[in-house]
Design a protein with these regions (language model features):
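Outer-pore turret/helix-boundary of cation channels
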Residues: 20-50, 65-68
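Pore domain of cation channels
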Residues: 46-49, 53-103
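Membrane-helix boundary elements
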Residues: 1-16
Length: 104
């Protein structure tokens, strides 16, 4: 139980310290989504949905860009999403290593 509590404490503290960067990446994802949505004539909700599905690299295929600019921005959205995910995973790994080293 102590390992879990320590992990959560370290993980949340790490996320807090890098929250400005994470918020910037989220803002980039939202802005690109709205640009693509306007360019493709999607609703704002559909554009936001597409942006986050693309950023987490799921890509259901129900919305897909048809225009060249939108296709380029979709690649950028996926790259930003991979960076976002990598940062969160790195923080989680650091928290796990530190908490395990302390208690195990």
């Amino acid at each position: 139980m102590e390992v879990t509590a320590e992990f959560l404490r370290l993980f949340l503290r790490g996320l807090y310290f890098i929250s400005p960067l994470l918020l910037l990446l989220l803002l980039i994802i939202v802005l690109i989504g709205q640009i693509v949505g306007r360019h493709e004539a999607w609703s704002k909700f559909d554009a936001l949905y597409w942006a986050f599905i693309t950023a987490i690299t799921v890509g259901y295929g129900d919305f897909h860009p048809r225009k060249r600019l939108s296709k380029g921005l979709s690649i950028l959205t996926a790259l930003v999403g991979v960076v976002f995910t990598g940062i969160v995973v790195a923080v989680a790994l650091h928290a796990a290593q530190t908490s395990f080293a302390k208690y195990i």
